[in-house]
Amino acid sequence: GIGRTRGKSDDSKWVEFFGPNANEFFLAYLLGRSYLAVRIEAILACGRFLANYAQGRLAGRVRLAGIGEAGPAALHAAALEPGLFASLHLERSLARWSDVVRAPIHRNQLIQAVHGALRIYDLPDLVAALPADKAQVVEPTDPAGKPAK
């Protein structure tokens, strides 16, 4: 999770690389889901609620921001239901899944994995599918969480 639902950190070295939500990732995987899909569904549920809040007066006015590890889930939500969000702002979010595959070491990327996705698309493809004036990407990161080149 993120915030209060974030997994518990412990002193093991693997947490540094796989992140505090690795257990949640494996639980979702064993249930036949990606952890990213769980996050995407939560974002879409919140977006739908906000769009219908106050008798629908917010419809089409919900702005979505994905900062850090929340970026890929926000990007997928915006790509899946582009009419739900007025705009998407990604900040310090993973630039490309293909970089994770090539990187010998990465940090906290396990929760972003979607089995077989790279056979079909990468994250920049989702950004390109959105209207240019609707999506803003600021300071994209590499698999280690450093500024992407």
Regions found by a protein language model. Give the residues of each.
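Conserved strand-to-loop "acid loop" that flanks and positions the catalytic carboxylate
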Residues: 137-143
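Glycine-centered flexibility sites
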Residues: 1-5, 66-71, 139
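Primarily recognizes the serine-hydrolase "nucleophile elbow" in alpha/beta-hydrolase
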Residues: 46-120, 126-129
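Short, charged/polar "capping" segments at the starts of alpha-helices
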Residues: 97-98, 143-148
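Short, proline-enriched alpha-helix->beta-strand connector loops that line the catalytic pocket
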Residues: 130-135
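Cap/lid segment of the alpha/beta-hydrolase catalytic domain
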Residues: 1-53, 58-60, 97-108
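Alpha-helical structural motif
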Residues: 23, 122-123
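Extracytoplasmic/secretory ectodomains and luminal regions
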Residues: 37, 124-125
